[in-house]
């Protein structure tokens, strides 16, 4: 019973720390940036960026860091070279899934795998990926489930507020560490294997530019 009380308190802190923008605060441009479906639209470009948002974030890209990485990547490589795709569908970014052993649920992982498989259908596309908070666990687990040929086409991954940072020792099991960059802000207790959310967990938008540069350095365009 005590565990459930602590868990509920931790999940409640997630809601408090991740306020949803009100309708009056969200411009049309910002709402559009929170959703990106280039791969689902059939856009085969030189680079595909797949991103999984954090818990309670709206859209399929979220608003804390996903859209920023996408826009910076397009600015760096050229908007005609980059397709951005958020993980939506079965991945609802709910709170309770954080408490599962994989820090997310199997349906969400399968949804991300589906996006990687979609990108792999583009024969000349190099794949990069990212995830924030619960989304980092989604991407981590999804990459482990890819077949070898698809995983080999994933050139770089960025993880923000990595919820499996402690469990997976700051990397994605079975994926090259030098192709992975983990962002864990000072004071972000999520990176220490807890569900405790602090203000630091909301700061990763500051790393969007650096993350895009890292991903750009991993591909050849």
From Swiss-Prot:
Q: Where can this protein be found?
A: Secreted
- Which controlled-vocabulary keywords does the entry list? Disulfide bond, Hydrolase, Secreted, Serine esterase, Signal
Q: May I ask which residue range the UniProt record assigns to the signal sequence?
A: 1-17
The domain of life is Eukaryota
Q: What induces this protein's gene, according to its Swiss-Prot or TrEMBL record?
A: Constitutively expressed in a manner dependent on transcription factor FarB: levels are unaffected by varying lipidic or non-lipidic carbon source, or by oxidative stress.
Question: Which catalytic reaction applies to this protein?
Answer: cutin + H2O = cutin monomers
* Main subcellular localisation: secreted
A cellular-component GO term for this protein: extracellular region
What EC designation does it have?
3.1.1.74
GO terms assigned for molecular function: cutinase activity
Q: Where is this site: Transition state stabilizer?
A: 55, 134
Active-site feature positions: 133 (nucleophile), 188, 201 (proton donor/acceptor)
Q: Does the keyword Secreted apply?
A: yes
- The yes or no answer to whether the keyword Disulfide bond is present is yes
**InterPro entries, per this entry?**
AB_hydrolase_fold, Cutinase/axe, CUTINASE_1, CUTINASE_2, Cutinase_monf
Disulfide-bonded cysteine pairs: these are 44-122, 70-84, 184-191
Q: Which GO terms describe its biological process?
A: carbohydrate catabolic process
Q: What does this protein do?
A: Catalyzes the hydrolysis of complex carboxylic polyesters found in the cell wall of plants. Degrades cutin, a macromolecule that forms the structure of the plant cuticle. Also degrades suberin, a specialized macromolecule found in the cell wall of various plant tissues.
Please report which protein family the annotation says this sequence is part of: Belongs to the cutinase family.
Protein name listed in UniProt: Cutinase 3
What organism does the UniProt record list as the source? Emericella nidulans (strain FGSC A4 / ATCC 38163 / CBS 112.46 / NRRL 194 / M139) (Aspergillus nidulans)
């Amino acid at each position: 019973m005590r565990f459930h009380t602590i868990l509920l308190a931790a999940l409640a802190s997630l809601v408090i720390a991740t306020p949803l923008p009100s309708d009056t605060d969200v411009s049309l441009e910002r709402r559009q940036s929170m959703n990106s479906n280039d791969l689902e639209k059939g856009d085969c470009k030189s680079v595909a960026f797949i991103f999984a948002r954090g818990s309670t974030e709206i859209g399929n890209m979220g608003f804390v860091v996903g859209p920023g990485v996408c826009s910076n990547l397009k600015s760096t490589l050229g908007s005609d070279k980059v397709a951005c795709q958020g993980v939506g569908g079965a991945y609802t970014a709910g709170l309770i899934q954080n408490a599962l052993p994989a820090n997310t649920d199997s349906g969400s992982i399968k949804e991300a795998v589906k996006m990687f498989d979609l990108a792999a259908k583009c024969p000349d596309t190099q794949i990069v990926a990212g995830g924030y908070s619960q989304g980092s666990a989604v991407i981590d687990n999804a990459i482990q489930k890819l077949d070898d040929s698809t995983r080999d086409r994933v050139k770089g991954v960025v993880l923000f507020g990595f919820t499996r940072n402690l469990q997976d020792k700051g990397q994605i099991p079975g994926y090259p560490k030098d192709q992975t960059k983990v962002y864990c802000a000072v004071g972000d207790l999520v990176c220490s294997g807890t569900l405790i959310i602090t203000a630091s967990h909301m700061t990763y938008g500051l790393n969007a530019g650096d993350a895009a540069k890292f991903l750009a350095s991993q591909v050849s365009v």
